[in-house]
């Protein structure tokens, strides 16, 4: 997992509430287990017209928002069925940070396990962030737990374990390997019994 200590990026806002995992990545695109190749299908039914041409009215298709790495969105983001592919699609598209009012518990965990930092901020803060220009950048300072922008600085909470994983770029496998000597010692002990 790629570490996030301080992330500086451009934003795009999709302020709908209750965006479910089927809207994030439709089930028709879940026919493989690789973690890449899903970005082109992110928000597919909204991003594309029936003829598969980009919908010019969809925020992610705006020419001046193509470099966005921070998604600002509504409440209850990632609700619906559990699918890790939703986090994969967001990351593959290039989003490193999602700022929402709340998340489905399973979706939140899928994001943290796959290197997408889910931040919770109140609606007032998100509405201000949603109005910044496409040229402006927002700073996510994870050690200080702050979202820093031209419209304000907003503190956020994150579990200390997840914070450590993001700052050090540790996924579950990397954490397991941190304890490899103890694992090997245990296996030798069990094998000798």
UniProtKB/Swiss-Prot annotation:
Catalytically driven reaction(s): (2R,3S)-3-isopropylmalate = (2S)-2-isopropylmalate
Pathway given in the UniProt record: Amino-acid biosynthesis; L-leucine biosynthesis; L-leucine from 3-methyl-2-oxobutanoate: step 2/4
GO CC aspect terms: 3-isopropylmalate dehydratase complex
E.C. no: 4.2.1.33
Gene Ontology terms, MF aspect: 3-isopropylmalate dehydratase activity
Pfam annotation, one family: Aconitase_C
Database matches in InterPro entries: 3-IsopropMal_deHydase_ssu, Aconitase/3IPM_dehydase_swvl, AconitaseA/IPMdHydase_ssu_swvl, IPMI_Swivel, LeuD
UniProt record, GO biological process: L-leucine biosynthetic process
Keywords: Amino-acid biosynthesis, Branched-chain amino acid biosynthesis, Leucine biosynthesis, Lyase
Function description: Catalyzes the isomerization between 2-isopropylmalate and 3-isopropylmalate, via the formation of 2-isopropylmaleate.
Stated family: Belongs to the LeuD family. LeuD type 1 subfamily.
Quaternary organization: Heterodimer of LeuC and LeuD.
NCBIfam families: leuD, PRK01641.1
Protein name: 3-isopropylmalate dehydratase small subunit
Organism: Listeria innocua serovar 6a (strain ATCC BAA-680 / CLIP 11262)
Gene responsible for this protein: leuD
């Amino acid at each position: 997992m790629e570490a996030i200590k301080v992330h500086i990026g451009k934003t795009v806002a999709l302020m709908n509430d209750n965006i479910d995992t089927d809207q994030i990545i439709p089930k028709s695109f879940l026919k493989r287990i690789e973690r890449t190749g899903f970005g082109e299908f992110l928000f597919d039914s909204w991003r594309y017209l029936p003829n598969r041409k980009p919908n010019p009215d969809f925020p992610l298709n705006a020419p001046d928002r193509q470099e966005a790495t921070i998604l600002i969105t509504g409440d209850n983001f990632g609700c619906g069925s559990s699918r890790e592919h939703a986090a994969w699609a967001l990351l593959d598209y290039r989003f490193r940070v999602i700022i929402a009012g709340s998340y489905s518990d399973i979706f939140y965990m899928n994001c943290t396990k796959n290197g997408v930092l889910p931040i919770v901020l109140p609606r007032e803060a998100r509405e201000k962030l949603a109005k910044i220009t496409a040229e402006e950048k927002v700073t996510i300072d994870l050690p200080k737990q702050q979202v820093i922008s031209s419209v304000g600085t907003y503190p956020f909470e994150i579990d200390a374990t997840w914070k450590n994983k993001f700052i050090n770029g540790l996924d579950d496998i990397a954490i397991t390997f941190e304890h490899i000597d103890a694992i090997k010692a245990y296996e030798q002990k069990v094998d000798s019994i």
